[in-house]
Amino acid sequence: MISYYFQGVALGAAMILPLGPQNAFVMNQGIRRQYHLMIALLCALSDLVLISAGIFGGSALLMQSPWLLALVTWGGVAFLLWYGFGALKTAMSSNLELASAEVMKQGRWKIIATMLAVTWLNPHVYLDTFVVLGSLGGQLAMEPKRWFALGTISASFLWFFGLALLAAWLAPRLRTAKAQRIINILVGVVMWLIAFQLAREGVAHMHALFN
């Protein structure tokens, strides 16, 4: 059964490691050294719930409803475009240091609310956890399924805590205005690239739906 665990770790890592809204938020909180470990924990716990729901039944529900899948897909496109626009707008700000200072004034509960929005209101997360991980893990028998789920969840915990700690360690170099501008441009461009790729999949899905 241990092989299913490592399959889960490998696939979970492949899904979690690419830059996305969650990773960008955890990284930025680590750079600011502002509740970064708490945010990493909440992200990992959110993934635990989403991955478990996807593998143990949620995937079948989503895949059996083409219109719901289309809604999630295009919702993901809109969310990623909006998030990318925000990052690029921050990067192009004439006074990036002032903008960063304003962010640093945010309280714990506002940061938690932002993290929950980035995770739970991001339809792209449901595609990863329900469609990809859920469809693969859902095909397994119950015991291998549990090990597979444990592997994907382990990858999530290791990644988010590792990212938060690494960002905090590199904070002196990454907190400069130049570094922040580069990071925000990178985040914005990647979000838009993912959105366009998802839009292509959405168009193909809609074409199949109407034919």
Swiss-Prot record:
The lineage of its organism: Bacteria, Pseudomonadati, Pseudomonadota, Gammaproteobacteria, Enterobacterales. Keywords: Amino-acid transport, Cell inner membrane, Cell membrane, Membrane, Transmembrane, Transmembrane helix, Transport. The keyword Cell membrane applies. This is Arginine exporter protein ArgO. It comes from Salmonella paratyphi B (strain ATCC BAA-1250 / SPB7). Its main location: membrane. It is found in: Cell inner membrane. Belongs to the LysE/ArgO transporter (TC 2.A.75) family. The gene is argO. The chain crosses the membrane at residues 1-21, 37-57, 68-88, 111-131, 147-167, 179-199. Pfam families: LysE. PANTHER family: ARGININE EXPORTER PROTEIN ARGO, ARGININE EXPORTER PROTEIN ARGO-RELATED.
